[in-house]
C-alpha cells in the first residue's frame, strides 16, 4: 500500500523541521518508499511513488539541481526533501526551481542539517511497513470471508483481525466491484463461474497488494482518491478487479461517491473505461461472499448497458436467476421453451424468435410490432400465424406467454455471461 504525502507531512513536519516551499498542490500524492539519491544516474532505478531525500553533495550549480528535480518529476517520484545547511542552502533554491515544482505539483521540502537522515528514513520505513502490514492483514481477512465463509477455522483467524479494525460481524456492508482497470473485456466470467460457489470459481484471484498488476497506476490513483476524500472504503484487489467494501449506506450516497471517483479518475488518467457493480446491502459480514457475486453480476450488466455503474438492486428478474447454481437447468428451460423456434429460424434463415419477443413486449399489438420490427403489418400477421399454426404456440394463453417471456429473460441472462 502507500501513505498520503499530506498526512505524512502533517504528522512529521515538526519532528524533522520540514518546510514545504513549493508544489503544495501535489501533497495528495501517495508515498510508497523513501529513497536517498545524490546522483541523477540512479534515477533509472526508481519505480515511481518514492519520496526522495538529497543533500546535494554533487550539486555544482543551479542548473544541476533544476535538471535533477526535473528528472525526479519525469520518473514520477512523489516529492523531494533537500537536506540544507551542508552542501546546499535555502538561497540555492531558485525561483525557477520553485516555479517548476509549483507548475508540476511536485512537493519540495527543506530539512535542516541538524535532522539526521537516518532518523527520518527509519521513521518513514516503519510507517510504510506498518501501513502495508495492516492493509495486507485486513485484505487477507476479508478475502477469507469472501472466499471461505463456511470455513470455521479461517473465520476464527480472520474475524478478530477485522474486529480490531472496526468491522462487526452483525453489521451490514456494501461491496463495490470494479472491473479490471486494464481491460474491461477480461472481467467477463462464464455463467458457471459466476453462479457456482465462489470457493470453486475464484479461489486464486484475490490478492492483498498492487504488485504485479498492469493496472496498478489506476488502482493507486483510486486508492489516492479514496484517501483524499476520506471515504470509508476498504480495498481488496484481485487479478482482474478491485473490490471496495464499506458500511451499508443509501444507494444515492454510493452513486454520488462513485460517480465522483469515476470523474476524477477520468480527469487524472484520461480514462473512465471501467464498469462498477454495487451489491445489495449484506445482512452481516459473512454475506460479503454473496455480495461478491452480486457486485460482479451488476458490473457485467453495467458493461452490457454501456453504463459506468449499476446496482444489483436494479437487476430485477436476474436477481432470482443468480441464486440458481445449476446453469444446465436454465439452459434446458430455454431449450424446452424456445428451442423449436430457434431451430426453425436456423433451418429457414428466418427470425421468428425476434417476432415472438416483440409480440410479447407489445402485448400482441400488430401495429406496435410492425413499428418495432420496421416491417409491414401484413408481414407481422403472416409471422404470427406461423408462430401459432406451424410452431404451435398458444399465444392467447396467459400461462404460455408468461413462460415464453421468462425463457427470454433466462436467455438474456445466459447471454450476459457467454
Outline where the language-model segments fall.
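Short acidic, S/G/P-rich loop/turn micro-motifs used as interaction or catalytic elements
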Residues: 57-61, 85-89, 182-185, 249-252
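Long, charge-dense
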Residues: 100-146
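Short, glycine/polar-rich helix-capping loops at beta-to-alpha or helix-loop-helix junctions
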Residues: 91-97
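Cytosolic nucleotide-utilizing catalytic cores of signal-transduction proteins
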Residues: 147-418
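Gly/Thr-rich phosphate-binding loop signature of adenosyl cofactor/nucleotide-binding cores
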Residues: 1-73
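Hydrophobic/aromatic ligand-binding patch that stacks against planar heteroaromatic rings
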Residues: 71, 100, 301
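Short hydrophobic alpha-helical runs that function as membrane-insertion/retention elements
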Residues: 52, 78-86, 99, 105-113
Amino acid at each position: 500500500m502507500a501513505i498520503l504525502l499530506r498526512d505524512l507531512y502533517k504528522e512529521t513536519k515538526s519532528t524533522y523541521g520540514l518546510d514545504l516551499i513549493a508544489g503544495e498542490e501535489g501533497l495528495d500524492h501517495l508515498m510508497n518508499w523513501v529513497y536517498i539519491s545524490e546522483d541523477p544516474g540512479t534515477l533509472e532505478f526508481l519505480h515511481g511513488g518514492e519520496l526522495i531525500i538529497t543533500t546535494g553533495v554533487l550539486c555544482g550549480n543551479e542548473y544541476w539541481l533544476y535538471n535533477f528535480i526535473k528528472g525526479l518529476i519525469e520518473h514520477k517520484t512523489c516529492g523531494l526533501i533537500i537536506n540544507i545547511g551542508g552542501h546546499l542552502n535555502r538561497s540555492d533554491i531558485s525561483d525557477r526551481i520553485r516555479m517548476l515544482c509549483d507548475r508540476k505539483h511536485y512537493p519540495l521540502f527543506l530539512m535542516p542539517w541538524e535532522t539526521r537522515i537516518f532518523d527520518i528514513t527509519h521513521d518513514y520505513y516503519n510507517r510504510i511497513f506498518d501501513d502495508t502490514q495492516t492493509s495486507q492483514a485486513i485484505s487477507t481477512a476479508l478475502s477469507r470471508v469472501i472466499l471461505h465463509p463456511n470455513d470455521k477455522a479461517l473465520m476464527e483467524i480472520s474475524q478478530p483481525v477485522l474486529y480490531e479494525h472496526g468491522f462487526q460481524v452483525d453489521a451490514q456492508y456494501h461491496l463495490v466491484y470494479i472491473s479490471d482497470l486494464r481491460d474491461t473485456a477480461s472481467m467477463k466470467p462464464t455463467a458457471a463461474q459466476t453462479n457456482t460457489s465462489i470457493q470453486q470459481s475464484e479461489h486464486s484471484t484475490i490478492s492483498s497488494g498492487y504488485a504485479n498488476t498492469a493496472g496498478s497506476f489506476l488502482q493507486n490513483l483510486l486508492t489516492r482518491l479514496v484517501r483524499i476524500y476520506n471515504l470509508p472504503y476498504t480495498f481488496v484487489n484481485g487479478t482482474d478487479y478491485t473490490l471496495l467494501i464499506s458500511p451499508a449506506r443509501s444507494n444515492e450516497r454510493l452513486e454520488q461517491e462513485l460517480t465522483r471517483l469515476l470523474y476524477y479518475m477520468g480527469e487524472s488518467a484520461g480514462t473512465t473505461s471501467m464498469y462498477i457493480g454495487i451489491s445489495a446491502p449484506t445482512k452481516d459480514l459473512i454475506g460479503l461472499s454473496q455480495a461478491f457475486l452480486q457486485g460482479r453480476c451488476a458490473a457485467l450488466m453495467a458493461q452490457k448497458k454501456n453504463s459506468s455503474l449499476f446496482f444489483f438492486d436494479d437487476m430485477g428478474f436476474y436477481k432470482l436467476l443468480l441464486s440458481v447454481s445449476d446453469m444446465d437447468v436454465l439452459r434446458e428451460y430455454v431449450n424446452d421453451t424456445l428451442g423449436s423456434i430457434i431451430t426453425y429460424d436456423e433451418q429457414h434463415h428466418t427470425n421468428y424468435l425476434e417476432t415472438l419477443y416483440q409480440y410479447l413486449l407489445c402485448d400482441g399489438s400488430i401495429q406496435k410490432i410492425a413499428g418495432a420490427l420496421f416491417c409491414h403489418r401484413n408481414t407481422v400477421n403472416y409471422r404470427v400465424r406461423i408462430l401459432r399454426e406451424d410452431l404451435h404456440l398458444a399465444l392467447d394463453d396467459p400461462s404460455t406467454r408468461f413462460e415464453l417471456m421468462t425463457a427470454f429473460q433466462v436467455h438474456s441472462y445466459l447471454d450476459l455471461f457467454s
